[in-house]
Curated annotation (Swiss-Prot):
Annotated residues for binding of Zn(2+) 2: 151, 178, 231
UniProt-listed SUPFAM superfamilies: Composite domain of metallo-dependent hydrolases, Metallo-dependent hydrolases
GO-annotated biological processes: 'de novo' UMP biosynthetic process; purine nucleobase catabolic process
PROSITE patterns: DIHYDROOROTASE_1, DIHYDROOROTASE_2
Organism (species): Bacillus mycoides (strain KBAB4) (Bacillus weihenstephanensis)
Protein name per its UniProtKB record: Dihydroorotase
């Protein structure tokens, strides 16, 4: 099916929002211009809505295989499509871990059969993410590994991390890291700060993250490796990354919507839906994240979509697993709380969610350019809705944002020229 989207707005190559039509033919973007006509295309009048590149998320947890009670590839990618995401990168904390030929082939088969959006899987750095034996990077790359990471457990052994970075560098691949120094975690469930002190909870200190990033940056410099930092959350981490970039070290970084919108002062009680890793930090950390995003220290926004069951989250803040869902709330949360408040522009938000992650990892995504694959999101910037977890397509309903009123909701997502998700009656 060919589609002609009429009367839309999009961000052009100069970074300006302008009026446009957009023609999709044979799964590709055929033309982007005003007043397009086409004979054999279904015309969809978007009536002034934003035509954006499909959103790109480099940090997601789909749980399959092994955690299908939390999420599946089918439910997770449907939720991604509803949130406007057309390309997502799946972390390897599955069971089994994609750490060998057999496991990666099985994962890719599942993705091919079930995914509603483009899914790029990470390969594990070490076997079973155990930190002691390196995986076969060459084989994992041949089988489509997006990059290499041990995700939420991190690589604690510096010699192992250096060896991994050297091998990744030879393959022109990135090493991606969740940064925590295990000896400093302190069995924490929240940030070590006012909230932990008030509620008598063990806290995770900020230096737990920043000291690990500092170590890895020096290792990346020695290995000449592209090193990407997951979900930056502290003022110290921003400073270390900024200094590294000024020194010419190949480091990039992401921040989550929840760390841009919330800090520890916003946690109303010991609610497990506010438990994520890294935890919500202090006001100074929150301000540093905004500053880092604006000055280029932080390159992109990624959701860290981490679904859990209601039963798991009901165990209380100390026992419940870390993580919140992110796909279906990311854009409206950021548009309402950053763009509408004048902290960043709409153009910047689009870049942080599209071309910045795509360019960082060399993906053919993130731009509405003629000839490219038609991965597109239509967003109604005027639509206001209340976040209601019962409407989520994700199995995970674990969000701290229930009841928040937000503007700027995706209404249609196109993947490879086909409609992957559409809000009922939004475009008629």
């Amino acid at each position: 099916m060919n589609y002609l989207f009429k009367n839309g707005r999009y961000m052009n190559a100069e970074g300006t929002i302008v009026a446009t039509d957009l023609l999709v033919q044979d799964g590709k973007i055929a033309k982007v211009a005003e007043n397009i006509t086409a004979d054999n295309a279904e015309v969809i009048d978007v009536n002034g809505k934003l035509i954006a590149p499909g959103l790109v998320d480099v940090h997601v947890h789909l749980r399959e295989p092994g955690g299908e009670h939390k999420e599946t590839i089918e439910t997770g990618t449907l939720a991604a499509a509803k949130g406007g995401f057309t390309t997502i990168c799946a972390m390897p904390n599955t069971r089994p871990v994609p750490d060998c030929k057999e496991h990666m082939e099985d994962l890719q088969k599942r993705i091919k059969e079930k995914a509603h959006v483009n899914v790029l899987p990470y390969g594990a750095i070490t076997v079973r993410q155990a930190g002691s034996e390196m995986t076969d990077f060459e084989t994992l790359k041949e089988l489509g590994a997006f990059a290499f990471t041990d995700d939420g457990v991190g690589v604690q052994d510096a010699s192992m991390m250096l060896a991994a970075m050297k091998r990744a560098s030879k393959l022109n691949m990135a090493v991606v890291a969740h940064c925590e120094e295990n000896t400093l975690i302190n069995k924490g469930c929240v940030h070590e700060g006012k909230f932990s002190e008030k509620h008598g909870l063990n806290g995770i200190p900020s230096v737990c993250e920043s000291v690990h990033i500092a170590r890895d940056i020096l290792l990346a410099e020695a290995a000449n490796c592209h090193y990407h930092v997951c979900h930056v959350s502290t003022k110290g981490s921003v400073r270390v990354i900024r200094d590294a970039k000024r020194a010419g070290i190949k480091v990039t970084a992401e921040v989550t919507p929840h760390h841009l919108v919330l800090c520890e002062d916003d946690i109303p009680s010991a609610d497990p839906n506010f438990k994520m890793n890294p935890p919500l930090r202090g006001k100074e950390d929150h301000a540093a994240l905004i500053e880092g995003l604006l000055d280029g220290t932080i390159d992109m926004i990624a959701t860290d979509h981490a679904p859990h069951t209601a039963e798991e989250k009901a165990q209380g803040i100390e026992r419940a697993p870390f993580g919140i869902t992110g796909f279906e709330t990311a854009f409206p949360l950021l548009y309402t709380n950053l763009v509408k408040k004048g902290i960043i522009t709409l153009e910047q938000l689009i870049q942080f969610l599209t071309e910045k992650p795509a360019d960082t990892f060399g993906l053919e995504a993130g731009r509405l350019t003629e000839g490219r694959t038609a991965d597109i999101t239509i967003i109604d910037l005027e639509q206001e809705e209340e976040i209601d977890p019962t409407t989520f397509l994700s199995k995970g309903k674990n969000t701290p944002f229930a009841g928040w009123k937000c503007q700027g909701w995706p209404v249609m997502t196109i993947v490879g020229g086909k409609i992957a998700w559409q809000k009922e009656s939004a475009l008629v």
